[in-house]
Design a protein with these regions (language model features):
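Auxiliary Fe-S-binding modules of radical SAM enzymes
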Residues: 1-34, 94, 100, 238-387
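Mobile, glycine- and charge-enriched loop segments
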Residues: 52, 56, 62, 66-67, ...
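Short glycine/proline- and charge-enriched loop/turn segments
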Residues: 74-77, 182-186, 261-268
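Conserved, mostly hydrophobic/aromatic
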Residues: 16, 40, 70, 109, ...
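Conserved Radical SAM active-site core
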Residues: 77-236
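N-terminal pre-triad scaffold of radical SAM enzymes
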Residues: 35-79, 84-110
Length: 387
C-alpha cells in the first residue's frame, strides 16, 4: 500500500468517515500489520477506552444429532452414530446446575439440528433451566436453529421467538453466519439457512427487543473480499436495527481429528491451511475499522489461543469471551493445546498483562464489576506483528 492511500485511509478513520468495500479490500492487502493494528486500536480506544470486557459463562450443547453435515463442523453426529447424544431436559438442568457458581452470569446454548426432537423440547428446556438458574441469562440458539424450529413446528419465526422469550430467552447466539457470500457458502454449509433467513431472524429478534451477537467464520476457502462483504452486510443490517451488540470473528479450526475413532471430521481440512496469527490479527483490525456501528468486537480465545487473543486486544477487540466449559462445536481442546476453561482470575491476569483494565459484564453488557488496571511495573504489552 502506498503512502498516499495509507494517509487517505487514516484521514477517513480519524474523521469518523465510513469506509467502503474498496477500502476494506485495500486494508486486507496491506502488509503493514503494525500500522493496521494501530489504526484499529485508535477506533477501539475511542469506543471503549482502555477497557476489556468479559463475562463468566458456561456452554451447554444438549444434542449433537444433526441433519446437516457442514464441512467445517466436528460436532455433529447422525442419529444412531457412535457418540451421538441427546440430553433429557432433566439431564441438561442437572449439568447446568453442576456448572453453576456464584459468579456465573450466562448460559450459552447451541445444538445440532435434531430431526426427531419435538419443538416443545426447546421452550421447555429454557423454562426449566431458568427455574433452576433464575439469575443466569440464557443466550440460546442460532438463527439456523430458529429456522429449523420453523420447519419442525410449522410455526413462524415470530411466534417461535415469542415463546422462547416467554420461556426465558434473553439473546440469540451469533452462529450460523459463517460466510454469507454464496460463492463460498455453498461449499461449507449443509443446511437451508442462508443470508436471507439469517438476517430475517436476527431482524425479528431485534424488533422484539433482543440484542444479539454476529459472527464470521474465517480462514478456510474464503478470500478477503468475502470477509469484507460479510461485514458490510451486517453493517447495513445494523444501520436498520441497531440490534447487534458485538461482532465475533471465529478462526476455522483446521486439523480436527476425532481422538476416539481417528476420523477426520473436518471435510475442509484437505483444502485449507489454518489462518496464521498474523492473518487473525489483520481480520480483527479490518473488522473493527469497517464495522463502525457495532460497539464491541470480541475475541473467542478458545478458537485463537490465549496469546493471539491478547494480541487481538491491541488490534481492535475489546471483549474476551469468558470462562467456557465443554465447548464442542469446532474443536477438541486436547488437539490444540488451548484450554477449555479459564477462571475469572485467569482472564483478569491475561487482560492486565495485555495492558488493559478488566471490566466484568453480563449478557446485556451491563457492568457488574470493575477492576484495577495493569501494574505498570510488570506490564509487558504484546507488540503488533508484521505479516
Amino acid at each position: 500500500m502506498d503512502v498516499g492511500l495509507k494517509r487517505e485511509l487514516e484521514d477517513k478513520v480519524r474523521a469518523g468517515e465510513r469506509l467502503t468495500r474498496e477500502d476494506g479490500i485495500a486494508l486486507y492487502e496491506s502488509d503493514d500489520l503494525a500500522w493496521l493494528g494501530g489504526l484499529a486500536h485508535e477506533v477501539r480506544t475511542r469506543k471503549n477506552g482502555d477497557v476489556v470486557h468479559f463475562n463468566v459463562n458456561r456452554h451447554l450443547n444438549m444434542t449433537n444429532v444433526c441433519t446437516a453435515s457442514c464441512a467445517y463442523c466436528s460436532f455433529q453426529r447422525k442419529p444412531g452414530e457412535k457418540d451421538a447424544y441427546t440430553m433429557r431436559i432433566e439431564e441438561a438442568v442437572r449439568l447446568a446446575k453442576a456448572m453453576e457458581n456464584e459468579n456465573l452470569t450466562e448460559l450459552h446454548i447451541v445444538n445440532g439440528l435434531h430431526p426427531n426432537l419435538p419443538w416443545r423440547y426447546y421452550p421447555r428446556s429454557l423454562s426449566e433451566l431458568k427455574k433452576a438458574l433464575p439469575n443466569v441469562s440464557l443466550k440460546a440458539f442460532t438463527a439456523t436453529e430458529i429456522h429449523h424450529f420453523e420447519t419442525i413446528s410449522g410455526m413462524s419465526a415470530s411466534d417461535i421467538l415469542d415463546e422462547l422469550i416467554e420461556a426465558g430467552l434473553e439473546s440469540l447466539t451469533g452462529g450460523g453466519a459463517e460466510i454469507f457470500d454464496w460463492e463460498v457458502r455453498q461449499h461449507i454449509v449443509d443446511h437451508r439457512t442462508h443470508w436471507e433467513d439469517w438476517s430475517r431472524i436476527h431482524r425479528l429478534a431485534h424488533s422484539k427487543g433482543l440484542k444479539t451477537p454476529a459472527t464470521m467464520l474465517y480462514g478456510h476457502i474464503e478470500e478477503p473480499r468475502h470477509r469484507v462483504d460479510h461485514v458490510l452486510r451486517l453493517r447495513e443490517l445494523q444501520d436498520e436495527t441497531g440490534g447487534f451488540q458485538v461482532f465475533i470473528p471465529l478462526r476455522y479450526q483446521h486439523d480436527f481429528v476425532d481422538m476416539k475413532d481417528g476420523k477426520v471430521r473436518n471435510k475442509l481440512q484437505a483444502r485449507t491451511q489454518m489462518a496464521t496469527g498474523a492473518e487473525a490479527l489483520k481480520t480483527f483490525a479490518v473488522s473493527r475499522l469497517l464495522f463502525d456501528n457495532v460497539p464491541h468486537v470480541k475475541v473467542f480465545w478458545v478458537m485463537h489461543g490465549v496469546q493471539t487473543a491478547q494480541l487481538a486486544l491491541q488490534h481492535g477487540a475489546d471483549d474476551m469471551d469468558g470462562s467456557v466449559v465443554e465447548y464442542k462445536i469446532t474443536h477438541d481442546a486436547d488437539n490444540y493445546g488451548t484450554p477449555n476453561k479459564l477462571t475469572r482470575e485467569d482472564l483478569l491476569d491475561l487482560i492486565r498483562d495485555a495492558g488493559f483494565r478488566p471490566m466484568e459484564r453480563n449478557t446485556r453488557y451491563e457492568i457488574i464489576r470493575e477492576y484495577d488496571g495493569p501494574d505498570p511495573e510488570r506490564r509487558e504489552a504484546p507488540q503488533p506483528m508484521r505479516v
